[in-house]
A protein has these predicted regions:
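Short, structured segments at the rim of ligand-binding sites
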Residues: 2-414
Length: 414
């Protein structure tokens, strides 16, 4: 497992060879669990991250049978209307876009439910308005609490064009609860990702050209069929393994089925720009295998917008810089000094304690590569970025380094 690999690399290793998966992305995992719950039949959802456990418990409370074996969940679907009412308010706060799908699901039930949206109110309001046009009654009780369910929905033609993707999935699922046909208007042919989630589960979603745009229609009353899903890995969790493989001669690592999304790949691109041999194999649907070979990283200066895009990976970049040919300067990270502790100062002191050649200045650090790091004891202060960076130190340092087990768990709970 990924946890086990992270523990192993705390001791020096000569090379990293093999294939691995990293924990799946939270939102796609939760979406797959909800769609499995409202399907007819049994689904297996694999590579589910620990953080999706709250969603699993919520679905169980609504009467869905879910068994777990390692990171794979077996879900006994209850169909569109087979969920069980609960007496207590259902808390959707903090669930992000998955709250949208649950809101639709609950609105379509025969029973009345109370939901607490908390900080999700503003995000959900757009979908609440759209569901209202289908006839779903969603009444506001307080600023962030709503009552819904028990209403009869009817298909309609939406005037809105190019409804946001996550709203669109909510509306299309809502259309399954409605009587008649629901029609959406779109301007582009490639806005069909959410449609594929339903088509893959046996739902007929018609898309036809009309004038300069497209009409997407869904008939109510269709059955959603079970579908097994393997959740793609979270790119950020692959970086420690990639970094370790880059710096150890003889390594040959493949990270399987990683999701690479626009706007989230800046650190991957930076590594390749400074000489990292990382081949990206496109598997389709935004999923990729990453093939990693040992590489000599080159000098670079990271500043301004470039820094902003990789700010979450500064610690790992600094660790990898100790193995580079030349000097890597990381500027414009003074904001990291303002949190619960001086992140930059702590990173500098930690690397210096390992005999790394590192310098500190008010807005950043500079690291000179080519000098072996000595073993030491590291405190990641519960920060996920430091945990993963210091785990890589454990592989690269002469003699290994100590990092607490509880600290090691935190990247998988964020």
């Amino acid at each position: 497992s990924f946890n086990r690999i992270m523990e192993e690399i705390l001791s020096p290793a000569r090379k990293i060879v093999g294939e691995t998966l990293v924990p799946g992305e939270r939102a796609p995992a939760e979406r797959a669990l909800v769609l499995a719950a409202l399907s007819e039949g049994d689904s297996k959802i694999s590579n589910v991250p620990v953080v999706a456990g709250r969603m699993v418990e919520l679905l169980r409370e609504l009467g869905v049978g879910i068994d777990k074996k390692k990171s794979t969940y077996s879900v006994k679907g209850v169909g569109l209307r087979g969920f069980k009412g609960v007496d207590e308010p259902i808390d959707l706060d903090g669930l992000g876009d998955t709250a949208l799908l649950l809101l639709t699901l609950l609105a379509g039930q025969g029973f009345t439910a109370r939901v607490k949206l908390g900080g999700e109110v503003e995000r959900c309001q757009g979908l609440i308005d759209l569901l209202g046009k289908l006839g779903f009654e969603i009444q506001r009780e307080t600023e962030s609490a709503f009552v819904l369910g028990g209403s009869k929905a009817k298909g309609c033609v939406f005037e809105e064009v190019d409804i946001e993707a996550e709203f669109k999935l909510g509306v299309m699922v809502g259309a399954l609860y409605a009587e008649g046909k629901t029609v959406l208007s779109e301007t582009a042919s490639n806005r069909n990702r959410m449609e594929r989630f339903l088509r893959g589960r046996g739902v007929e979603v018609e898309r036809r050209k009309e004038g300069q745009g497209y009409m997407v229609s869904v008939d109510g009353g269709q059955v959603v069929r079970a579908l097994d899903v393997e959740v793609a890995g979270q790119l950020a969790l692959s970086y420690p393994l990639i970094g370790a493989a880059l710096c150890r001669k003889g390594s040959k690592l493949t990270v399987k089925r990683v999701a690479i999304r626009a706007g989230q790949r800046a650190f991957l691109d930076l590594l390749r720009q400074i000489g990292a041999e990382i081949d990206i194999e496109d598997l389709g649907e935004g999923e990729h295998d990453l093939h990693v070979r040992p590489s000599e990283l080159k000098s670079t200066r990271v500043a301004g917008q470039r820094t902003e895009k990789v700010i979450d990976h500064v610690a790992l970049l600094a660790v990898l810089a100790t193995q580079a040919a030349g000097e890597i300067v990381i500027r414009d990270i003074e904001a990291l000094r303002q949190g619960a502790f001086d992140y930059v100062g702590h990173l500098f002191e930690s690397l210096r304690s390992l005999d790394a050649r590192v310098g500190e200045f008010p807005e950043g650090i500079v690291v000179k590569g080519g000098t072996p790091m000595m073993a030491g004891r590291l405190d990641a202060k519960g920060d996920p970025g430091l945990v993963m960076a210091f785990a890589v130190v454990g592989l690269l340092a002469e003699g290994g380094s100590n990092l607490s087990h509880t600290c090691l768990q935190c990247p998988f709970k964020t």
